[in-house]
Amino acid sequence: MTRRLPTATAARPPSAGSHFKTLKHESLASTYITPIDREDIHALAIELDDIADLTNQAARACEMMGVERPSHAMMGLLDVLVATTAELVGAVAKLRSRDYPGIFAAKARIRTLEKQGDRVHRDAVSRLFLTGEIDVKVLLRERIVLDDIETAVDHCEIVADTLSNLAVKHG
């Protein structure tokens, strides 16, 4: 069974991020006491939005360059991205419940997943260049999409570091 890239569903409208930011600002402005500093909440929200933007960028690149079916390497990286973002969702929930040891454990799992993503990316790019007869358009398209997905995975580790720093600060 061949899977298609979910470009139509992955692409979010430009107003969705703006709407999220507006809600965040309104919520922070109307809440007198927050469990963690407003600046920390703001920084975390920006970093989480960056992951959505980077993921959307990869989807737009697929659509723009006519990727109809993801390559095996793309699917491998997308699987890592899905697993990493699922870990982040759990880690953010642990911040709310003040489960700081759980945040540190999630950070370790995210780091492991990010390293796995690095290996998948490196191997895929290496195969692209070591493969004999390959169309230069295919090579560029694959490389750009793989780089975009890898950047989103890398940013998940940055968010995990931020969550870990918040756990140290408030724990």
Protein language model features and the residues they cover:
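Cytosolic, long alpha-helical scaffolding segments
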Residues: 1-171
